Design a protein with these regions (language model features):
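Beta-strand-loop-alpha-helix segment that lines the small-molecule cofactor/substrate pocket
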Residues: 2, 70-128, 143
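Conserved acidic residues
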Residues: 33, 53, 67-69
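Conserved SAM-binding strand-loop segment of SAM-dependent methyltransferases
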Residues: 52-59
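Alpha-helical elements of Rossmann-like donor-binding domains used by nucleotide-donor carbohydrate transfer enzymes
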Residues: 19, 45, 61, 70, ...
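N-terminal Rossmann-like dinucleotide-binding module
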Residues: 1-50
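Nucleotide donor/acceptor-binding cores
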Residues: 4-6, 119, 149
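Short, conserved SAM-binding/catalytic segment
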Residues: 46-52, 113-117
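Predominantly a Rossmann-like dinucleotide-binding segment in NAD(P)-dependent oxidoreductases
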Residues: 127-194
Length: 194
């Protein structure tokens, strides 16, 4: 008997979904079943690229789909709490891109919804799996480099020099503290550092 696969609904078809969806596409126990984006044409294109059966422009439509077991929320930060709560209340498991919310009050509301629903809630932090970070952790554990007392990191993100281009129009919300929670340095890229 074939093992049942978890059916994922991707919420947000922006640039980060290119990276996030690789794991689902490569995992035999997962299937991208639907894509939701406010831009229906983008949702349809992504659905075609990833072999999803459905594309939606409305989160409510995706959450009403009985063939979706879990959602991966890849939207701007200010939308995370309301979308996660709606998904949990609809009986879906939820994966949230970092940062999960903009405030402790939002986090309390999301975790309360997860407890009430009995569904799984996870926050995805991809940097902990990056090979350089894994190697540094290994070297520290082995005592090979002594005890770190400070770390200096130079990064470039969303720019061609970093090997990953993000359109300026897709970056605009990251400059608005009410939508991103504190600016790109603190709440977007900075989140990885903690």
């Amino acid at each position: 008997m074939a093992e049942e696969r978890i059916r994922i609904g991707i919420v947000g078809g922006g640039r980060i979904s290119d990276l996030q969806c690789l794991g689902y596409l490569e995992h035999p126990g997962a299937e991208i079943a639907a894509v939701c984006d406010v831009d229906l044409v983008l949702a349809q294109r992504r659905a075609h690229e990833w072999g999803a059966r459905s594309a939606y422009a409305s989160l409510d439509e995706l959450l009403a789909d009985p063939d979706i077991d879990a959602v991966d929320i890849l939207t701007p930060h200010h939308l995370h709490a309301s979308q996660a709560i709606a998904a949990l209340e609809a009986g879906k498991h939820v994966s949230l891109q970092k940062p999960p919310v903009l405030s402790l009050a939002e986090w309390d509301a999301v975790t309360a919804a997860a407890r009430r629903s009995g569904r799984t809630l996870r926050v995805f932090e991809n940097f902990m799996y990056y090979p350089p970070h894994q190697k540094a952790k290994e070297l520290i554990a082995q005592g090979a480099i002594g005890e770190p007392i400070s770390v200096r990191v130079k990064t470039a993100a969303g720019h061609p020099s970093a090997g990953w281009t993000v359109a300026p129009s897709s970056q605009a919300w990251r400059m608005d503290p009410s939508r991103c929670g504190g600016g790109p340095t603190t709440f977007d890229h900075g989140y990885h550092c903690f």
